[in-house]
Amino acid sequence: MTTTYAVLSEGLEKNYGEVHALRGLDLAVPEGTVCGLLGPNGAGKTTAVRILTTLTAPTGGRALVAGHDVTRDPAAVRRAIGVTGQYASVDGDLTGRENLRLFARLAGLRGRAGRARADELLERFGLGEAADRTAATWSGGMKRRLDLAAGLVTRPRVLFLDEPTTGLDPAAREQIWTAVRELVEKGSEGTTVLLTTQYLEEADRLAGEIVVVDRGRVAATGTPARLKARIGARAEVTVAEPGTLARAAAVLDQLTGGRPVLDEQRLTVGVTVLDGALDGTLTLPRIIRELDAAGVPVTDAALRPPTLDEVFLRLTQPHGTAVEAATADQEYAA
């Protein structure tokens, strides 16, 4: 079965003078999926999104969005996409219903069609009861949901969500996550979502595929589970006697090939089980058996997968603030 890609870029480059924001970025996002774009500040995420949404031109390479070349046919790209940023673009002096009808008119949906689409989205995002109140009286989470609804007025084939829950409290963030999940899982419009976020939990919860960007290139790509498997699980044991810490570390070193970390205060030894070196269902029992054979009594033992935060830190490198500042300044100077 042939895969159709909603977003496809090959060798995408962007230079700002001597600053190389993108250095050959390759993306392939299948239709009807949620792809999370992660990376440290200055990695090139925002630059990539600006190119894919036709807000800036690439220096090199090519990109297709919904089958249209972003350089050769930017108007067609704009007709096929929706964009929602980290700041709600709604008008506080208008009601929620008036906001969506305005967006509908701007998108060419007038009269009955525009009113029907606005009403449909208000109900879909749980905003019907507040629809006729001015948006200025709404909570931050409600405004962000309205902003997300506005991005869907035209039934876009690709929706770009740029840090959509920044600054929201946990409850409001969960509401946005639910709306995005339902958009892809239950929706009939076939929308593809490209999500950039600073919340790694957000990418873990929403994205079927994650692309980690570092220094303008793709550092890694895969499902959250596969990315976590790349750095392995972490085994940690708590010994009963302080004098057995070194022995416990030696056993873990021999079993896993990792570098045990000792904590004399907590009487623990932790080590990363690299790249699935041992089967996940067998690792912990085997560790306990080997420790027992070595005369190391333990009071606790655990094996846990790494968090996406740990994956992120392992796969990315520290950036220089000078490069970050130069890129950001030139991107937003216009």
Task: List where the protein language model places each region.
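Conserved protein kinase catalytic domain
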Residues: 78, 122, 149, 228, ...
